[in-house]
UniProtKB/Swiss-Prot annotation:
One GO cellular component, as annotated: NADH dehydrogenase complex
One Pfam family cited in the UniProt record for this chain: Oxidored_q4
Protein name: NADH-ubiquinone oxidoreductase chain 3
Subcellular location: Mitochondrion inner membrane
UniProt keyword terms in alphabetical order: Electron transport, Membrane, Mitochondrion, Mitochondrion inner membrane, NAD, Respiratory chain, Translocase, Transmembrane, Transmembrane helix, Transport, Ubiquinone
Organism: Ailurus fulgens (Himalayan red panda)
Record-level GO BP terms: mitochondrial electron transport, NADH to ubiquinone
Superkingdom of the source species: Eukaryota
Enzyme Commission number(s) of this protein: 7.1.1.2
Regions that span the bilayer: 3-23, 55-75, 84-104
Length: 115
C-alpha cells in the first residue's frame, strides 16, 4: 500500500509541475537565452570555422582526468569488500596513473593555453 501511495504522489507531483511549467509564460525571452549555444559561438555563422588544436588537447585531457576521477568515486563503498588489499592496490594504481599523467602533461606544456 505504501508503494502505491508513494508512486501515486510522485506521479501527481510530477504531472503538476510539468503542467505549471508548460502553462506559465516565460518572462525573460531574448535572443541570448533562446540560443542553444551559450559559449560565444554564432550558431548562424560558418560551420567550417577552424579551432585551435590546443583547445582539443585540453578538452581530451579534461575528459581523461574526469574519467579517472569517476572511476575513483565508488571507493568509499569499495572499502567494505572482503579483499581490501586488492581494492587499495587498484585505488593506488589509479591515483598514481592520474599523478603520472598530470606530471607528463605538465612537462610537455599541454596545460598551457598560450604558446
Amino acid at each position: 500500500m505504501n508503494l502505491i501511495m508513494t508512486l501515486f504522489i510522485n506521479i501527481t507531483l510530477t504531472s503538476l509541475l510539468v503542467l505549471i511549467a508548460f502553462w506559465l509564460p516565460q518572462l525573460n525571452i531574448y535572443t541570448e537565452k533562446t540560443s542553444p549555444y551559450e559559449c560565444g559561438f554564432d550558431p548562424m555563422g560558418s560551420a567550417r570555422m577552424p579551432f585551435s588544436m590546443k583547445f582539443f588537447l585540453v578538452a581530451i585531457t579534461f575528459l581523461l582526468f574526469d574519467l579517472e576521477i569517476a572511476l575513483l568515486l565508488p571507493l568509499p563503498w569499495a572499502t567494505q569488500t572482503v579483499n581490501l588489499t586488492t581494492m587499495l592496490t587498484t585505488a593506488l594504481l589509479l591515483i598514481s596513473l592520474l599523478a603520472v599523467s598530470l606530471a607528463y602533461e605538465w612537462t610537455e606544456k599541454g596545460l598551457e593555453w598560450t604558446e
